[in-house]
């Protein structure tokens, strides 16, 4: 790789912001490894077997330092990898540089345009020497969507003829351009995919929809619903990274403010805890009576967005839904209200409706939306993931849980893929418990061991699994 590659955003080898950041990135990768015991131990356990030898992984997941450790783990187990970020703002440029310098084709930099984002999503499927990706590692489902929608458009271009938002404009234009060059670009690549492992709630929802409709073209493992992912990454990760993003972006004092968390799933629970821990009065909006009751029993006030809009100071969406905060909500907000999203896509806040007003950029990923009456609303990360757009995402330790699950899921689908139908699966309980076990020593936790008599009394193997699949942690 030569100097031209460093400066060009049109290289066929990789596209990163600045390769000179690689040494900094390598130092942070080394530090992160000390906080990612699951991935490190999986490398040691499987490196001799090389279970991913022959796997060509197309990865679409936030290109962070922690993701760099995941990529190097996949490669240590035999995989070839090409990588793009799954969000235009989430890349850490020094991480991308370090991974690119290490020989992995990476197509990611912080602040991509939507056109660049979808071009990079294509690049992870463009393998040299006539080869094709045979595995997808996805976060949010965009890589999976790209091949499936593109294959559909090969037969009927009308499916990409009516975009409804700026994201679809860029996506459809990108697909049309590739079809003009190769009318079977997508179906050719789709035919080689053995399966996908999906990281997040939003992407999993897409997979289940396709399974229900009979449109899922390959097996999928739902990594998100592994207990050691959803109850750790989603809850404890967001509990730390949400306020990190808000405070880096705004320097606001959270104590004494009224903060609204839209959605009280695992992500919302972590967000509410962190805001209350810093002294905010936390209100929750919910559609689900069970989650609403949970929030109320934890001492949060459960309200509607219509009620809260003109009263609260900080708004956080964590629903995975559409237009949870709409134009009229923002129009009603107080001067300098802070609005942000920690769900995967930018559709939770109706950002498009505010483009009619004046925007004033304060610094990267921090904008004032100036309404006609002079009131300003502070929008973070343009409504995209605030913890990755305005900070560095979840801590390494909790991401080790998630990425150990991802690695085990990739191994399972690649090695045992023939036994799976085109359905969505979760990892077995034994592997979930294994992931947790790998992380205990790092934080000084010691397990109590059942005696044979105790195991027999409750009807479990003394080495686990300890809970039935229906158990709710």
From Swiss-Prot:
Enzyme class: hydrolase
InterPro entries reported in the protein's UniProt record: Adenosylhomocyst_ase-like_sf, Adenosylhomocysteinase-like, Ado_hCys_hydrolase_NAD-bd, NAD(P)-bd_dom_sf, S-Ado-L-homoCys_hydrolase_CS
Record keyword Hydrolase present: yes
Binding site for substrate: 64, 139, 199, 229, 233
CDD domains tied to this protein: SAHH (cd00401)
Pfam families documented for this protein: AdoHcyase, AdoHcyase_NAD
Tagged with keyword DNA repair: no
GO biological process: L-homocysteine biosynthetic process; one-carbon metabolic process; S-adenosylmethionine cycle
Protein localization: Cytoplasm
Pathway: Amino-acid biosynthesis; L-homocysteine biosynthesis; L-homocysteine from S-adenosyl-L-homocysteine: step 1/1
Protein name: Adenosylhomocysteinase
Organism: Paraburkholderia phymatum (strain DSM 17167 / CIP 108236 / LMG 21445 / STM815) (Burkholderia phymatum)
């Amino acid at each position: 790789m030569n100097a031209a590659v460093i400066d060009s955003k049109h290289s066929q080898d990789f596209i990163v912001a600045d390769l000179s950041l690689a040494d900094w990135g390598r130092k942070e990768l080394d530090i992160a490894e000390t906080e990612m015991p699951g991935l490190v131990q999986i490398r040691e356990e499987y490196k001799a077997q090389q279970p991913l030898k022959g796997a060509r992984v197309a990865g679409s997941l936030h290109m962070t330092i922690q993701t760099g450790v995941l990529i190097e783990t996949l490669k240590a187990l035999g995989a070839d990898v090409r990588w793009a970020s799954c969000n235009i703002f989430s890349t850490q440029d020094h991480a991308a540089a370090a991974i690119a310098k290490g020989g992995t084709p990476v197509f990611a930099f912080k602040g991509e345009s939507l056109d660049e984002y979808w071009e990079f999503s294509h690049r992870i499927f463009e393998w040299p020497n006539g080869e094709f990706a045979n595995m997808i590692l996805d976060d949010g489902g965009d890589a999976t969507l790209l091949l499936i929608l593109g294959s559909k458009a090969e037969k009927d271009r009308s499916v990409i003829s009516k975009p409804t938002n700026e994201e679809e404009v860029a996506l459809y234009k990108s697909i049309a351009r590739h079809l003009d060059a190769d009318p079977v670009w997508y179906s050719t690549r789709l035919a080689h995919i053995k399966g996908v492992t999906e990281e997040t709630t939003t992407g999993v929802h897409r997979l289940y929809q396709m399974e229900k409709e009979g449109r899922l073209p390959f097996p999928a493992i739902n990594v998100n619903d592994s207990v050691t992912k959803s109850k750790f990454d989603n809850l404890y990760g967001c509990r730390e990274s949400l306020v990190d993003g808000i405070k880096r972006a705004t320097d606001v004092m959270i104590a004494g403010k009224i903060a609204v968390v839209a959605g009280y799933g695992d992500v919302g629970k972590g967000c509410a805890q962190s805001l209350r821990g810093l002294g905010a009065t936390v209100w929750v909006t919910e559609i689900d009576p069970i989650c609403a009751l949970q929030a109320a029993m934890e001492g949060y006030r459960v309200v509607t967005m219509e009620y809260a809009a003109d009263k609260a100071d900080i708004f956080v969406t964590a629903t995975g839904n559409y237009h949870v905060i709409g134009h009229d909500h923002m129009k009603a907000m107080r001067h300098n209200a802070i609005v942000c999203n920690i769900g995967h896509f930018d559709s939770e806040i109706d950002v498009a409706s505010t483009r009619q007003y004046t925007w004033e950029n304060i610094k990267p990923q921090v904008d004032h939306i100036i309404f006609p009456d002079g009131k300003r609303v502070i929008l973070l990360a343009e409504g995209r993931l605030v913890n990755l757009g305005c900070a560095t995402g979840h801590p390494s330790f909790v991401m080790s849980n998630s990425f150990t699950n991802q690695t085990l899921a990739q191994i399972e689908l690649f090695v045992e893929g023939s036994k799976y139908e085109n359905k969505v699966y979760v990892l077995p309980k034994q592997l979930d418990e294994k992931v947790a076990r790998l992380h205990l020593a790092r934080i000084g936790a010691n397990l109590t061991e059942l005696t044979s008599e105790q195991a027999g009394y409750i009807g479990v193997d003394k080495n686990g699994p300890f809970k039935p699949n229906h158990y709710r942690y």
